[in-house]
Amino acid sequence: MSRNELSGSLGNKVYLPNLNGTNSEKVYFLGCGKKDKEMSEQEYLSLAEKIANAAIESNTKNVHIYLPALAVKGRTEDWNFKILARTLEASCYKYFFKGKKVQSKNILSKVTLLKNVDKKGLTAFNKALKIGHVIGVGMNTSRELANTPANICTPTFLAAQAKKLSRSFPVIKTKVLGEKEMRKIGMDCLLSVGNGSAQESKFIIMQYSGAAKTRKPNIIVGKGITFDTGGISIKPSPAMDEMKYDMTGSASVIGTMRAIAEIKPKSNIIGVIASAENMPSSTATKPGDVVKTLSGQTVEILNTDAEGRLVLCDALTYVERFNPANVIDIATLTGACVIALGHEATGMFSNDQKLADSILESGYASCDRAWQLPLWDSYQDALDSRYADIANIGGRAGAITAACFLSRFTKKYSWAHLDIAGTAYGGKVGKKSSGRPVPLLTEYLLSQK
């Protein structure tokens, strides 16, 4: 302090090795800003990241952190610690591929957060830490799957990971349908996407039962295109490697179910994944083909690169059998959503404003925000087809017309669609998975009492 190295300004960091009076080899001081001054949410998120980075930089397995009481605008102290725990867990995750084995590396073994608190406050404190930590684990589970290269992460691999989660957490029951079972019940639209691939398409159902059977389940449905070449309507080569991330919707379902399995809320939750690989070949679906959906509606496929909605529409029809309280689908569905919202907000559409408001609130609570876009009837005409009930593309306003397509299959229940094309990867996190929207989904599901 005498050398003015420790100013206390937000994010200011000083490292002191072997500090007298402590048993620690390394001590870091981080400035938290002016005392009694309310900080913004963004300032706190930045501080949490700096704390996590300092913990990682220490290159030690065990870290103790003392965080003073900080006033964050519109937030509680429990929220502060929940976000810090989540940030610590998420920041420690590193993905790399070495030799013959996919490996992930979690740097820290133990983190202890220190706080002066009474017995009543301790319960809330521990709950906030647990939820934050578990959501971070769920994010990392999602990131691990999304980052895995497509020659490994196939629909069969995704199904195996879902079953593996069930073995680790028996509270989740997993069922997998192969192509034979899907064809038998009429999921021809989903199957059409994988026609050109040697990889078998899979349909995965993960059920968590934390309440009476009479209670209607909340359902999350993930798009699981493990690699999207565009099919016959093939994509340009630059950045096509990023199309391994076209299964991030399904990764977020597995990550969220992982978090739910640990938190054990008193509700019923079902995670569904519609997975296929979209490849060009002599057996691939062609522009102009007409296929029948599980709902009985027919679809004219004008562009085989608009395939996500084709797997989702059959999944959205399938979940009717569960008599859901509501359904949320999650998909890297349109580049148009990235143009509209960039990499900050997830695009959200809904046929139920109460559900939409709850999702927006959960996005705010989790700092994993969504923004509602219109789902007006006037956009539906863009999907008119000369040869089928509906076309799979609709011209301009691509994120909206894609949501309009899905809305044709959700008339029997409360539904929302999350277009995560801009938030699942890219942007600030670079060419890797962000783990979003696991925080939003988990926050929402925990809010459903």
Report each predicted region and the residues it spans:
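Short amphipathic alpha-helical segment within the helicase RecA-like ATPase core
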Residues: 1-224
